[in-house]
Amino acid sequence: MPSPSYNRHIIIASCFCCLLIFSSAARVPKASKKHLARVKQLLNDEAERHNTLIQSDSVTVFDDIQRNPNTGVHHDELAVNNADEYFQGDVDLSEQQVKIIEDQFTQGKREKRKIGRNPLYKKWDTRGPISFDYAESIPFQTRQKIRSAMLLWQQHTCLRFEEGGPNVDRLEFFDGGGCSSFVGRVGGTQGISISTPGCDVVGIISHEIGHALGIFHEQARPDQERHIAINYNNIPLSRWNNFQAVGENHAETYNLPYDTGSVMHYGPYGFASDPYTPTIRTLERVQQSTIGQRAGPSFLDYQAINMAYGCTESCADLPCLRNGYTHPNNCSMCACPEGLSGRYCEQVYPSNAQCGGVIFATKEVKYITSPNYPDKFPIDTECNWIIAAPIEGRVFMEFEGDFDFLCEDTCDKAYVEVKYHSDKRLTGARYCCSLLPKNRFISFKNEMIIIMRGYRSSGAGFKAKFWSNLGEPEGVSTPLPPTTAPLPEISETTQKPEPTTVQSTTTYTTAIPRRTAKKQFFTRKPITIPLTPLTSSSTTTESTTVSSTTQSTTWLPTEPSFATGETEITTASPTITLFPSLSTILPPINSLAGVLPSTQAPDIINSVLECGCGAWSEWQGECSQQCGGCGHRLRKRECKKEACRKEEKRPCNFSACPDGTNFLINNAEFHILWRGCCVGLFRSGDQCSALETESNPFFKIINSLLNIQDAKNNDTLIAKRMMRGEH
């Protein structure tokens, strides 16, 4: 006969299995509309008090901006959602989070945020991948886009995702009629609503995943008022809460700068009463068309997650240039801001057309243009330039001539971007549409980065002239900015040919296009590319009467080269770096400098294709239990591999069992009830629903019965039984 101790452990294990199964199967409920409305009213009241103090000073900054009637409306989550259903436009709150926020108002602790802090917002356990699933309401095409958005986060951070993984705390993508997510981990199965159509855009999905990982909206940072102004005169009073920041005691900015190019930033016309007047105005006027992009996470969005989850703590610090930092997926190279590449961000990112490169600015005016200017540039063009002045100089730039790109409120598909800040992590001023920018740009230091993108459309593009306030450097000089590690003196040998008249012919070398996630959903093996040395490659920089050629050797993947005909525009080959070589002062440069590392971030998203599984059957039979949320229905599929999941269960019959019912024994199942609900659920009226593990009173009792060794022994076994459907 089994001992009492043995029986006790069997009962405890059974209860724990029930807890795991049902806390993962039923999505965490959102706060009630009544409680959500109460929090919004508190925020509205505070916004009104704050606005009374500042409105007279800030309202004038909107007088000179009116929406171009020919501008297309930029699509984002706010265009899909009913604002009454969400906190800050697309954020779900649990009842516990609502209570904590209300308590903060009561206690007078109002701060601001970027990344969620405990106890209100929790981070995920990174000792393993984050488990996720899809509800039946998510179609196949949308699932592919969700995987693509996850790969963006996975390739640039240390976080990993696993489809159908075993964790109790997990994500479930479903169609809830809008685009929304909780912020951070809330415990159990938490939903991310991706409505189709409407939210099924990779950029919007990456925004909602960003929330789930713990990121708030960028415009709600503590330094908000130093970067943007809110036009409360153009926002209904009931929507003011969407522009307020929430406590610093709930969040951490990690001293990262404000980023107008964040995928988490509102667009300029969100919640506008008058659709032709913005609700958000960037104080740097040239950034107005930058805010609100939904192409994908920015460099600083990735860095925020890497810092929050300690992704580079196990790596040694590298002497990364231009505000790069050690790559979380490859400790031997740097993660580089947009437009830069190389092991230490010492190179310009390769372009995929006849454009880009590194060009020295002098007092003499030079030009760059989009490919084929003034004819149309090819669709999906990517160009990157570094314009460098002498070390103490500045770069000046102005646009002229025809200017033509796809026209939207936010420029995130086809545009030219000017990165003039000394901090190269910051997204620059973006311009699109057909109105020629009238600004003169001046770099903060001696470098300016120009980025041009032509996704989904074609147009004439741009022409820009640039120059420096100083002349050509005479001998040994480098435009490289100071690094985090001391560098020895750098020298360079330049061949100076005899003065001659320049022929207007430039030879280009095709560069490797930027890798994107859409063709790498389930790549598991490292990608390697054969390399060919390009010996003594040269680039010619035109001036009025003199040609100067700088020779260098660059390793790049083998690609054909081609020549262009005559052109009026000076440019440089995108594969040539005019900066001195760092090979003598730093470790050998990665032979794949300029593209993603050959040792790619491991892709551990499970693929139905790998398993060779067929379609799921319909849900079979009646629910195995009549009440309490304990029962389940079953569906099956055929798979080629035994290790793949062939059966799936989902809970059913969530009506509470009659009072006094303490357990259910039926259909070869045994379930313990807690107030009429299966363990892992809690009673709300006559229904059973999910409850966060940390708040579950029955879990606490179970936990107190287990000693430390019991927990260690049972943990893995229970998880395996769960996956086999043994409970």
UniProtKB/Swiss-Prot annotation:
Residues 610-658 form the TSP type-1 domain. Expressed in the epidermis, the excretory canal cell, duct cell, pore cell, and excretory gland cell. Expressed in an oscillating pattern in epithelial cells with increased expression during the lethargus phase which occurs during molting between larval and adult stages. Not expressed in seam cells or in the RIS neuron. GO terms for cellular component: extracellular region. Its EC number is 3.4.24.-. Disulfide bonds join C158-C311, C179-C199, C355-C383, C411-C432, C611-C644, C623-C652, C627-C657, C639-C644. It holds the Pfam family CUB. Keywords: Cleavage on pair of basic residues, Disulfide bond, EGF-like domain, Glycoprotein, Hydrolase, Metal-binding, Metalloprotease, Protease, Secreted, Signal, Zinc, Zymogen. Residues 473-506, 532-561 are annotated as: Disordered. Residues 1-25 form the signal peptide. Residues 26-114 form a propeptide. Its cofactor is Zn(2+). It is an enzyme of class 3 (hydrolase). Zn(2+) binds at H207, H211, H217. Its main location: secreted. Binds 1 zinc ion per subunit. It is found in: Secreted. Residues 306-345 form the EGF-like domain. SUPFAM superfamilies: Metalloproteases ('zincins'), catalytic domain, Spermadhesin, CUB domain. Residues 113-312 form the Peptidase M12A domain. The TSP type-1 domain may be involved in modulating sleep behaviors. PANTHER family: DISCOIDIN, CUB, EGF, LAMININ , AND ZINC METALLOPROTEASE DOMAIN CONTAINING (PTHR10127), ZINC METALLOPROTEINASE NAS-38 (PTHR10127:SF810). This is Zinc metalloproteinase nas-38. The lineage of its organism: Eukaryota, Metazoa, Ecdysozoa, Nematoda, Chromadorea. The gene is nas-38.
